[in-house]
A protein has these predicted regions:
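A helix-centric hydrophobic-segment signal that preferentially recognizes long
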Residues: 2-162
Length: 162
């Protein structure tokens, strides 16, 4: 009888370990995807700053100082994304003026900016999809136990502008 009880306890412990490792691998998989997306977001944001600097050289020299100060700030990618959108929208509104319509260099930069925005939105969607999966695992049984023991936090979601 003692052997049966020990066998059942050992089986339950082994089952718990297998379940724990299974969900840990799922978490690790999604965290790997999120970190890859974060790296891509940072690269694309750097390219966006470079393009905005070139546009600012043509349109508004005062914005160059603002962008240089922005470049020196220590911001999270979420804050960076929000502030760059507002700066980019201001510059693009100024670029829509009639005096700049015939400027081919500016038009090429705006096209590059639009391509960069499409890439950024795609990477942000990829990040959001994987962050939502991690956040869902954080609230479901038994993966919430794994998340609790490994101290996983919920991830922030980007608000993507249309």
């Amino acid at each position: 009888m003692l052997y049966v009880i020990c066998g059942i306890v050992l089986f339950l412990i082994l089952l718990f370990i297998i379940i724990f490792l299974h969900f840990k691998k799922k978490y690790d998989f999604y965290f790997l995807k999120v970190s890859e997306a974060n790296n891509n977001i940072e690269i694309i944001i750097e390219k966006k700053i470079e393009i905005l600097l070139k546009i600012a050289q043509i349109i508004d020299k005062d914005k160059i100082k603002e962008l240089e100060e922005f470049k020196g700030k220590e911001l999270t990618s979420h804050q960076c994304y929000i502030e760059l959108n507002s700066i980019g929208n201001k510059l693009l509104k100024e670029a829509d003026d009639e005096e700049y319509e015939s400027n081919k260099k500016l038009n090429n930069l705006i096209d590059r900016f639009d391509d960069n925005e499409c890439d950024l939105k795609g990477v942000l969607k990829y990040y959001n999809d994987n962050a939502v999966e991690i956040n869902n695992y954080k609230h479901k049984f038994p993966s919430n136990i794994v998340g609790f023991f490994l101290h996983y936090k919920e991830l922030d979601i980007y608000k993507i502008e249309k």
